């Protein structure tokens, strides 16, 4: 009997496969729903997530930013740099069961991150990067067992670092830098035995550096800079044998440098600058043969640099400036083949500069200024052919400048002032094509300097030397901003080439032997701020064209042989503050306008035939010459009567014109039916009939918008501090039309309340349009606002403080011009995020307070980050924004701090310049902030040419 075999699948196998398929489908559907839920909570203006939608296939593996494994499960979500905003409302997306990587860095996401993100996220998660956003709130507690990388840097997180951070036992990378974290660095970090990279920089951490860090034997990178850490550096750090990078800068660390740091044989970067370290540098430090960059600057270190420095054969950068180091500069530095940057300035080094310095090095920057160095310059300094900065000022160096520097074509910045150099300039020195800054002042240099060819030159100071001959032709130096040739023996006339400086701001030719007339063409230098031609032999008249100067502040023509009358329109230069015309041959009357109104007697003395009706000038009064003839008497009487009549008529018009030009007109008073008395003060006559008290009060019911009979719109705002209004009205009287200031047209007040009426400009607030603005438009906004500030600070006397420079207070009109709505003190609420430290603490408001607010505005325009929520302000976020910016800028990660919508490839150099300016404007000490004129000059002088930006050189290249 034959037997047939039939194969049947057991029913339980079919059932199992069915449920597996069902489970697979459910998982797939669950992933899709979680991802779409994430998409619904954020804004995606550039439509990067357009592929995230229901479709016939519903295959999430094809979606932008999503990566799946070989069984089509989502393992990676990378949406970095997509310009997305909004909040992550739940941690649901983080629960995708196979998810290993989440990267949401470099966006504009904000708000707190979900509190359960570290307790409910997928246990498979290994990489979490939320850096460079605007997240706030505290860092959640919890534990992810397999997490390798946690990067929350460059956000606005607050609060303390919890001790349970120590349970993330698998972490290799922890970066919490660039936030507003407070409290101590937890010692529990020592439990992260596998950690390789630790960054807590640019926060507000206090206390000491925990000794427990010495247990983290796998650490390669420690960055705790830009905090408020104190105490001594733990010697236990010297036991971290794998350490490559140690950075503790900008803290309050004190005491000696532990000798154990010399045991870090793999160390390549050691940065301890800007602390309070003292004592000698341990000799063991100079045995670190792998060290590339060493920076102990800005401390109180003493002692000498040993010859052991010759062992550091990998060293490229040595920074020991601003300490109390003594002795000679060791010969050992000359044998460091890779040495590029040597900065030892502001110490007490003595003796000569090592004879072969530069011969066996690769020098690009040498700064030994402000020491006690003597002797001559080595002729080997530029042997590498790469030397760009040579800074040796304020020493006692002598002899001639070596001929080799005349052939150093790489030089860009040379500062040799305040030494004892003598002899002639080396051949070729005045034809170096890349030099942009040259200061040789206060030496004993001599010779003829009539040949000059430096096309990149921006600043030249040859003052206090013995140069002679005629003035050079600087026609090739179109970029010159400052030229100081004072206190030499230069003769001859001013050459025509001197009139062709489109950017010159400071011109000083004083104390020479220059002759001839002052060229009228000099007035074509529209950016000239300071002009000093004193103590020469100029003849002829003061050019009337000088009235065309637009920003001239100081004018000194004293001690010449100038004759004729002073041009009457010279006093019309609004920016002119100081004038000195003493000791000339001038005659006639002194102008009674502008800077001449308060001129000091010493500034006009020595002009025998000069007179003035201003007794404070010390000049004799101007007298009318009288004759005795009867005909003359009748002529005088008739003329006097005619003049009186003319004065009477003119006076009426002058008063009228004065009222109109100063925008001060009669006060309108009205009493309403309920007995309330109102006063309306107008500042422009054309609006006097535009609205009444009733229409002003009615506008308060219609979104505070007032429309006159011609359809012109105005905005009505309530004055917050009524008592301040009278003194504020005097401020408003100073304001005339300026294209970058919203015009205040009137005030309306009763005994209990007051309102301010200003024009309503068609356009949008800066806060509404900032995202996505091109660099060109941002530049225009910066310049427009600082021009408004210059008008308020420099053209109004006394100066007017703008007060509020937040993007909410700046309107971009239809012509793309920024318009500042004045926040006069006492009138409009200040935005605390833009408030200077002295204003917050002492209620002091000055022009330097405005500069601080402008600096914050620059940071906002550069980074796209703002700090305007009340919670952030109470936590000191605007201070943290500045600290974060300093941290980011000092490391020059331009792509991490610049707004992603700005094209850095074209404007990188200009952006870096503006960031540097922003940090100067936000200095804690008001005295360290630049004045408004300097801010404007800095903005105008920035160029968009590209420049290299390495990790550390950006800091050092801005120092000298």
UniProtKB/Swiss-Prot annotation:
Residues 656-960 are cytoplasmic. Its EC number is 2.7.11.1. It is a single-pass type I membrane protein. Glycans are attached at residues 70, 83, 103, 108, 129, 134, 191, 228, 252, 324, 362, 372, 537, 580, 600. One of its GO terms (molecular function) is protein serine/threonine kinase activity. Residues 691-953 form the Protein kinase domain. The chain crosses the membrane at residues 635-655. The modification Phosphotyrosine is found at residue 834. ATP binds at residues 697-705, 717. Keywords: ATP-binding, Cell membrane, Disulfide bond, Glycoprotein, Leucine-rich repeat, Membrane, Nucleotide-binding, Phosphoprotein, Receptor, Repeat, Signal, Transferase, Transmembrane, Transmembrane helix. The modification Phosphothreonine is found at residue 692. It is an enzyme of class 2 (transferase). Residues 1-29 form the signal peptide. InterPro entries: DNA_repair-toleration (IPR053211), Kinase-like_dom_sf (IPR011009), Leu-rich_rpt (IPR001611), Leu-rich_rpt_typical-subtyp (IPR003591), LRR_dom_sf (IPR032675), LRR_N_plant-typ (IPR013210), Prot_kinase_dom (IPR000719). It is found in: Cell membrane. It comes from the Eukaryota. It holds the Pfam family LRRNT_2. Expressed in pollen grains and roots vascular tissues. Present in roots. Residues 30-634 are extracellular. GO terms for cellular component: endoplasmic reticulum; plasma membrane. Receptor with a serine/threonine-protein kinase activity. Together with SKM2, LRR-rich receptor-like kinase (LRR-RLK) required for male fertility by the perception of CLE43 and CLE45 peptides and the transduction of their promoting action in pollen tubes, especially under relatively high temperature (at 30 degrees Celsius), thus conferring tolerance against high temperature probably through the maintenance of mitochondrial activity. Seems to not be involved in the perception of CLE45 peptide in roots. PANTHER family: DNA DAMAGE-REPAIR/TOLERATION PROTEIN DRT100 (PTHR48060), L DOMAIN-LIKE PROTEIN (PTHR48060:SF21). Belongs to the protein kinase superfamily. Ser/Thr protein kinase family. Self-interacts. Binds to CLE45 present in the pistil, particularly under relatively high temperature (at 30 degrees Celsius). This is Leucine-rich repeat receptor-like serine/threonine-protein kinase SKM1. It comes from Arabidopsis thaliana. The lineage of its organism: Eukaryota, Viridiplantae, Streptophyta, Embryophyta, Tracheophyta.
